[in-house]
C-alpha cells in the first residue's frame, strides 16, 4: 500500500479544516451571547408579527387543573421539575400503576397505549393537543418564562432572567442580534472556505 494514497490526502485535509469549523461555530455562539447581553431597553418595535394575541384567561381556562407550586404560574410546568424525566413532556411514574388512560403495563417499564393515547405512560391524549388559542408545539412568553404547548399542557423553561417581560422587545432583541452577527459570520465562513480551497490545492 502506498504511503500517499488519495484517501489519506482527503482525510488529512478534512483534519486540517475541522479546527477552522470549530472556531467558526465558537465565534458565532460568543457573538450571539454578547448581542443578547448588550441589548438595552430601547428595542425597536416589531411590526405585526405577534399574532394571535393570547389573553391570559384562555390558557388559564384550558390548564386550570394544574397546581401552583413554588411561585410557578398556574397552568405552567417547569421542564426541570419532572423528577424521572430525561425528555420533554414525560411525567413521573404513577404510584399505583405505570400506565394512564387504560394502557397496559409491560414488564413494569413501558406501556402499550389504547387508541388516541401516546407517551411513555399513555399520558397524552392526541385528540386534545392545543392550549386554547395556542397550537400544539407553539412557543409563548408566559409570566416572564418561555413556554411551549405540548399535548394541551404548557411547559416552561426554568430560571430565565429577562430584564423585561415584554414579548415585543424579547422578539426584536433576537432578530437584532442575529442581524448584527450575520455579516461577520458570513465573512468568517468565506475565509474558512478560501483556506480549505488553498489547503486542498497544496
Curated annotation (Swiss-Prot):
Modifications made to the protein after synthesis: N-glycosylated.
Database matches in Pfam families: CFC
Domain EGF-like: 94-123
InterPro entries in the cross-refs: Cryptic/Cripto_CFC-dom, EGF-like_dom
Domain of life where this protein originates: Eukaryota
Tissue: No expressed in adult tissues.
Keyword entries, A-Z: Cell membrane, Developmental protein, Disulfide bond, EGF-like domain, Gastrulation, Glycoprotein, GPI-anchor, Lipoprotein, Membrane, Secreted, Signal
Disrupted-gene phenotype: Positional defects in internal organs. The lung presents a right pulmonary isomerism. The stomach is located on either the left or the right and the spleen is small and has an abnormal shape. The apex of the heart pointed to the right or left. In addition malpositioning of heart outflow tracts is observed, the aorta is connected to the right ventricle and emerged from the heart in a ventral position and to the right of the pulmonary artery. This one is connected to either the left or the right ventricle.
Entries under CDD domains matching the protein: EGF_CA
Localization: Cell membrane; Secreted
Bilayer topology annotation: Lipid-anchor; GPI-anchor
GO biological process, one term: heart looping
GO cellular component, one term: side of membrane
Gene3D superfamilies associated with the record: Laminin
Entry annotated with the keyword Ribosomal protein: no
SS bond list: 98-105, 99-111, 113-122
Protein name (Swiss-Prot/TrEMBL): Cryptic protein
Higher taxonomy: Eukaryota, Metazoa, Chordata, Craniata, Vertebrata
Amino acid at each position: 500500500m502506498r504511503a500517499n494514497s488519495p484517501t489519506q490526502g482527503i482525510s488529512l485535509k478534512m483534519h486540517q479544516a475541522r479546527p477552522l469549523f470549530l472556531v467558526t461555530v465558537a465565534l458565532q455562539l460568543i457573538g450571539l451571547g454578547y448581542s443578547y447581553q448588550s441589548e438595552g431597553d430601547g428595542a425597536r418595535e416589531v411590526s405585526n408579527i405577534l399574532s394571535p394575541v393570547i389573553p391570559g384567561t384562555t390558557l388559564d381556562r384550558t390548564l386550570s387543573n394544574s397546581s401552583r407550586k413554588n411561585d410557578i404560574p398556574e397552568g405552567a410546568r417547569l421542564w426541570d421539575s419532572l423528577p424521572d424525566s430525561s425528555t420533554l413532556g414525560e411525567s413521573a411514574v404513577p404510584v399505583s400503576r405505570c400506565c394512564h388512560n387504560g394502557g397496559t403495563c409491560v414488564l413494569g417499564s413501558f406501556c402499550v397505549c389504547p387508541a388516541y393515547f401516546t407517551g411513555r405512560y399513555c399520558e397524552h391524549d392526541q385528540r386534545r393537543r392545543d392550549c386554547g388559542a395556542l397550537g400544539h408545539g407553539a412557543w409563548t412568553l408566559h409570566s416572564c418564562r418561555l413556554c411551549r404547548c405540548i399535548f394541551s399542557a404548557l411547559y416552561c423553561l426554568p430560571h430565565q432572567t429577562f430584564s423585561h417581560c415584554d414579548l415585543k422587545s424579547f422578539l426584536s432583541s433576537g432578530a437584532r442580534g442575529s442581524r448584527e452577527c450575520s455579516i461577520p459570520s458570513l465573512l468568517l465562513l468565506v475565509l474558512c472556505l478560501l483556506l480549505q480551497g488553498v489547503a486542498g490545492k497544496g
